[in-house]
Amino acid sequence: MLKKVLSVLCLVPVVATAQSYIVYDFTHDRVLESSSPNHVQPIASVTKLMTANVFLENNRNANCTASITDDDFDYIKGTHTKLPKYTPISCNELLKAMLVHSDNYAAHALSRSAGMSRLQFIQKMNEKARELGMRSTRFSDSSGLSDSNISSAMDLVKLAKYSLNKAQIKNLSNMPSAFIQAGGRSVFVKNTNKLVREEVFDAAINKTGYIRESGYNLVFVNKNPCNHSTICLLYTSPSPR
């Protein structure tokens, strides 16, 4: 069954070369296959799944807005954003930009928009990791640009399963593209996962990530059960394919 699942997901070549991976059956709560599932390493933008959970659980203002400022710039990797700076943007639109397009500036802006400082937000991320039993996980920023954001495939299974409780995360995970409303403009962005972008597969949870120190990362939970099972695939690979 596993080979059938992976072939449907178009991920057999990726798993074959992955440094660490786990295929987990949420329906029956068991590991189907894995390699070095407890290996700890940077997780890049997969971090944003925790950012989304912490923001949704702590933000008390349904109409909150935030502006991207100099404090949100990427001084680590030098990435850019399509969103306008110094312009009030709905937090819901920032969340969309972060989960669909993996916008780092949006992740930074959200981390100071839930009624706490950025440092307090990061502390909440680490507290949530401990609460979920993610013993190998540490966060130092909300975007994943820092290589100090570390975890393991086994820990990320717990985060993926927990994220299934958030309707907004599930809805945004499966958007091939989106328009972000920002300062009177509609900014078009595409999903960072080709499987979702080209509508090859429906995702319940989907987050990609890449920095040089981590390689290519993916957390993917299929939306429609395969052989009556909900499959969670997490991998880290030196190449995107």
Model-derived segments and their meaning:
Residues 4-13:
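Sec-dependent N-terminal signal peptides
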Residues 9-10, 51-55, 181-182, 191-193:
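Intrinsically disordered, low-complexity boundary segments flanking structured domains
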Residues 16-167:
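Active-site-adjacent loops and short helices of periplasmic peptidoglycan-processing enzymes
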Residues 19-20, 116-237, 241:
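Penicillin-recognizing serine hydrolase domain
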